[in-house]
């Protein structure tokens, strides 16, 4: 057998040995859960509706994500603003898909995220550490933190100017109101409540939020 035939034979054997290994590596890669791209903030900023504007809310999401090991991504809070230069929450969170901290896909795109298409509910709306928020669903009828600040209509767009839905564009910890969604999709114990636009709060203090089942928590999305 000449040298050329020997080389061909060796290459054939190596191909038989290597290709299955590459296939296994590819399969392992396919089986890896997607990177976290969504979470409910585990804690609030703590100053009622004064989040420091959109920038302050985004920084809060980024800080929590970084502490949880996902600081390599760019994070934004799902919040709208009103009035001149109004911002739509849906326009500031990227295009998806987004997975929670357990690797479950919350929504594949903006279309699937809104209305009743998303996977946002008490089971899957986890915080950045993989924990569930307090809800009446878990057995305590008198305590819930399912109200999540959004200032947003059901389709993810901003409310028109007029009645405050954003605590003065997330700068007020006193007067005004914030539109919230129910992350567990329940109103008391009745299912079907929107995750992003359920009701307004009676004011913008931290105490106002707590009084109606909230804590000033945020939805955080990876934009990249």
Predicted regions and their residues:
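Secreted/extracellular ectodomain signature
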Residues: 23-224
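Short intrinsically disordered, low-complexity coil segments enriched in acidic
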Residues: 7, 18, 64-67
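Bacterial N-terminal signal peptides
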Residues: 9-21
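Bacterial N-terminal signal peptides that target proteins for export
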Residues: 1-10
């Amino acid at each position: 057998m000449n040298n050329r035939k020997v080389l061909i034979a060796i290459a054939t054997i190596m191909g038989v040995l290597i290709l299955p290994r590459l296939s296994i590596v590819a399969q392992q890669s396919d089986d890896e859960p997607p990177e976290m791209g969504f979470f409910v903030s585990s804690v609030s900023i703590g100053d009622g509706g004064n989040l420091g504007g959109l920038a302050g809310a985004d920084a809060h999401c980024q800080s929590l994500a970084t502490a949880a090991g996902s600081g390599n991504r760019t994070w934004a809070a799902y919040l709208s603003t009103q009035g001149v230069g109004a911002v739509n929450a849906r326009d500031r969170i990227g295009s998806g898909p987004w997975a929670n901290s357990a690797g479950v896909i919350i929504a594949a795109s903006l279309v699937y995220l809104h209305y009743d298409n998303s996977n946002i509910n008490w089971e899957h709306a986890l915080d950045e550490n993989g924990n569930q928020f307090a809800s009446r669903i878990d057995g305590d009828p008198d305590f819930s933190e399912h109200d999540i600040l959004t200032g947003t209509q059901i389709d993810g767009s901003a409310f028109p100017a007029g009645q405050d839905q954003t605590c003065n564009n997330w700068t007020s910890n006193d007067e005004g109101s914030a539109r919230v969604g129910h992350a567990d999709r329940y109103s008391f114990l009745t299912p079907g409540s929107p995750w992003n636009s359920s009701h307004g709060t009676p004011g913008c203090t931290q105490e106002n939020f707590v009084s109606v089942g909230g804590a000033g928590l945020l939805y955080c999305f990876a934009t990249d």
